[in-house]
């Protein structure tokens, strides 16, 4: 797994991500990256926003997993959780750890919440029902459901299954309730 730690690495992120079929994930190392820029890391992370979004975009375009940098303050669990939330919102699918006490909060924060899973299941079910009826357009509540929304819902459900949060055959159970 390559770790991008320089301005040049950020600019060549897609090239690195696609350099070999063995590359399945790519991370950013923000301590080295910010040192390369000659700036300090800050809590609001403005100094690394470009690099982080560039890494996520390169990874997604290459079909690999983007991994965010470690959170250096091992005593600040609340700060870690906020950082992980921000990482997830940017599109990262994981984060490095520098201390064992960071593992559980990171896993919990990247796992989909119950409400996210339930919403994703409703979207998938509504889309399947519409397909079965031959409808090209479907809505759930006041929101239109299109292919990107369904894809995002499928990703959420797949992760929930992989983490053991729901059963693999959830759709059989939920459609008969």
What label would you give each PLM region?
Residues 1-177:
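Expand to "…catalyze enediolate/carbanion chemistry for C-C bond making/breaking, isomerization
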């Amino acid at each position: 797994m390559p770790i991008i730690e320089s301005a040049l690495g950020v600019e060549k992120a897609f090239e690195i991500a696609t350099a070999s079929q063995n590359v399945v994930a790519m991370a950013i190392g923000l301590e080295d990256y910010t040192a390369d820029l000659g700036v300090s890391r800050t809590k609001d992370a403005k100094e690394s926003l470009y690099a982080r979004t560039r890494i996520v975009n390169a990874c997604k375009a290459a079909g690999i997993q983007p991994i965010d940098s470690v959170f250096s303050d091992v005593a600040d669990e609340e700060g870690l959780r906020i950082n992980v939330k921000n990482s997830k919102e940017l599109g990262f699918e994981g984060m490095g750890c520098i201390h064992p006490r960071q593992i559980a909060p990171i896993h919990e924060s990247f796992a989909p919440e119950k409400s996210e899973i339930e919403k994703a299941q409703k979207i998938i079910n509504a889309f399947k029902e519409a397909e079965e009826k031959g409808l090209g357009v479907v809505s759930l509540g006041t929101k239109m459901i299109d292919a990107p929304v369904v894809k995002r819902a499928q990703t959420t459900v797949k992760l929930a299954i992989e983490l053991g949060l729901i059963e693999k055959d959830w759709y059989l159970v939920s459609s008969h309730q």
